[in-house]
Amino acid sequence: MPRSPLKKLLLLGGSHAEIPLIQAAQSLGWYVITTGNNRDGLGHSYADKTVFADFSNKDAMLELARSEDVQAVCSGCNDFALLSTVYVCEKLGLPGHDSYATSLEIHHKDKYRALAARLGIPTPKANSVRGEHEFDTALSNLTFPIIVKPVDLTGGKGIHRAANPEEARIAYKDACSRTREDHIVVEEFVQGSNHGFSAMLVKGKVAFAFADNEQYFMNKYLVSGANTPSASGGETLAKLRDYSERIARELHLVDGILHIQYIEKADGTPVIIEICRRPPGDLYIKFVKYATGVDYPKTIVMAETGEDISGIADVPTQGYWLRHCIMAGPDIANGSTVRDVTFAPEIQGNIVEKFLWCKPGETIADTLLYKAGIVFFRFGSLAEMHDKTARMTELAKIITA
């Protein structure tokens, strides 16, 4: 049955990552309009209407929201989408979002590092760099290895680890070529295990929290998978709740998601390396729903449209789960042709859902970024989860012609 266009929601994004948000919004009665530059985005076909436009252009998004006369705007799984969303909502007086200035404090890496230092939250020692002179000063202030990254990009784009000044200068030029800002951030490398922590804030308190263990494959700065329950202990997770609430109090954050990526050091200290107030990508919000039973996509849409989410239950992970992105292995070269994706017999019984979008005959342009799809697995024990996760890139493989 078609939804009435009287209750219209603009969603900034239309990739596979936004599909759970589109479906959740529609289940809440919204007529969903998606936008974005990518005409091949898999999410657009799920929407009630699509208007192709650049969601990173906040004034274009404001004009689109006005012309469509929408009653709500939701961010897709991208920081540019989030910043445009909060800008539009601030201009139109729509609910569910922080101010544009507050959002910059969280989503621009240099501003967040300064905030964390002010609040006593562990964060990598970092310098904001404008120009080569400041870059040289940063190198003298920091201990190698260092990480060089744009302040405004996610998904591992433009991030490099440098072991010496020569590598650092190459990394600096690449980061500068990618950013839309006039500066980048340079920070000390933190040694430890990588994790995610996703919280739902209600009145400045963590009302729900979920944690995972991250996996990386060929691209060391792009998450290729996550499993749960997290290996982080109760004390570490309690610190993350406390840090989240410190940030919420300081910035007067509205109710809704606060998502964190952190490195846990050997002593259990969680060092926050990325933070955002928009849904994580690659169907992570569906992963949370599978693992806890909490309808995370629906809760996110409710929060972003100004509805009450105080009824959310703080449910722990139920069982042993993996969300795995099917990516190209070391035996596959750029320009290879996809033939199939295969799954070993021993994991067939663990598969809960397969969402494959690759097509036989398509070309893999960049092996470090190419994804054939996403698969959700459930395991019978913690040991099975860890064993099969460690071998998953061999158990689920892209086959090329």
Specify the residue positions occupied by each region the protein language model found:
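Short beta-strand-to-loop capping motifs
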Residues: A163-N164, A199, I326-P330, V375-S381
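Short, well-ordered beta-strand elements within core beta-sheets of diverse protein domains
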Residues: H160, E188, S232, K289, ...
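A structural supersecondary motif
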Residues: L258, T299, A344-P360
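ATP-binding N-terminal substructure of ATP-dependent carboxylate-amine bond-forming enzymes
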Residues: M1-T102, H133, G306-S310, P316-T317, ...
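A glycine-rich beta-turn/hairpin centered on an aromatic-Pro dipeptide
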Residues: T305-G349
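Conserved protein kinase catalytic/activation segment
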Residues: G268-P270
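ATP-dependent carboxylate/phosphate-activation module, predominantly the ATP-grasp catalytic core
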Residues: E166, E188-L253, I257, E264, ...
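Active-site nucleotide/adenylate-binding loops and adjacent lid/helix of ATP-dependent enzymes
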Residues: S103-V185, Q191, V202-K205, S230-D242, ...
